[in-house]
């Protein structure tokens, strides 16, 4: 199941951003976030990275590959 639309909308609303504002902040077409949230289309990898960075979460979280929203840095030994 594609969790991107639901997670994207929830995170965007939590940040109190309009769809248009998030699209512009990420350098995307003004309708891009709306299309992603409705499932009309999926973001290209570079757009997904921009959105994740702007919302402060990992791309894996947006895609539903993990239930942890933040990346964890594990120091090398």
Question: Which sequence ranges carry the predicted segments?
Answer:
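Short, charged recognition helix plus adjacent turn
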Residues: 63-77
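Short alpha-helical DNA-recognition segment
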Residues: 16-35, 50
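Residue-level detection of the helix-turn-helix DNA-binding "recognition helix"
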Residues: 13, 27, 38-40, 49, ...
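A short, Lys/Arg-rich alpha-helix, primarily the initiator
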Residues: 1-14
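DNA major-groove recognition helix of helix-turn-helix/homeodomain DNA-binding modules
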Residues: 44-61
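Short Asp/Glu-rich motifs
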Residues: 31, 42, 71-72
